[in-house]
């Protein structure tokens, strides 16, 4: 039996068609998986003062503000994976810089999602402070 070459129609049926079908099914199966997040009530964050090299842990309940230096940190939503899933925590955080001058309006320096698994991508980078999400919890 002659061996099909890459230009023959037999090559498409024998080699490429099953390969394409497997790739399609793998993509479909990956998109069918659902990710479960549980609502959290408290976000635990790590705050670094770059001037003094002081590292602090902030516990911020959802809907309440906490202050670190001149920053006001407000967690608007907090969620985490259940224990049987891959560890991941997410929080929607708004951070405002109050500054030292009371006559100047506070400036919003961060508004968005922070993820504990990707601190380099989703952390606040400020000239004086860094803030990253450590965890979200139900209590």
Which residues make up each language-model segment?
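N- and C-terminal low-complexity/disordered segments
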Residues: 2-5, 9-14, 30-139
């Amino acid at each position: 039996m002659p061996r099909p070459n890459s230009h023959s129609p037999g090559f498409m049926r024998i080699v490429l068609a099953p390969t394409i079908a497997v790739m399609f099914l793998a993509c479909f199966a990956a998109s069918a998986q659902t990710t479960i997040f549980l609502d959290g009530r408290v976000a635990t964050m790590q705050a670094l003062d770059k001037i003094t090299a002081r590292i602090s842990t902030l516990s911020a309940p959802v809907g309440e503000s906490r202050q670190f230096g001149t920053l006001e940190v407000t967690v608007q939503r907090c969620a985490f994976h259940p224990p049987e899933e891959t560890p991941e925590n997410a929080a929607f955080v708004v951070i405002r810089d109050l500054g030292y001058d009371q006559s100047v309006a506070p400036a919003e320096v961060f508004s968005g999602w922070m993820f504990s698994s990707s601190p380099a991508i989703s952390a606040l980078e400020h000239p004086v402070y860094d803030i990253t999400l450590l965890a979200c919890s139900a209590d």
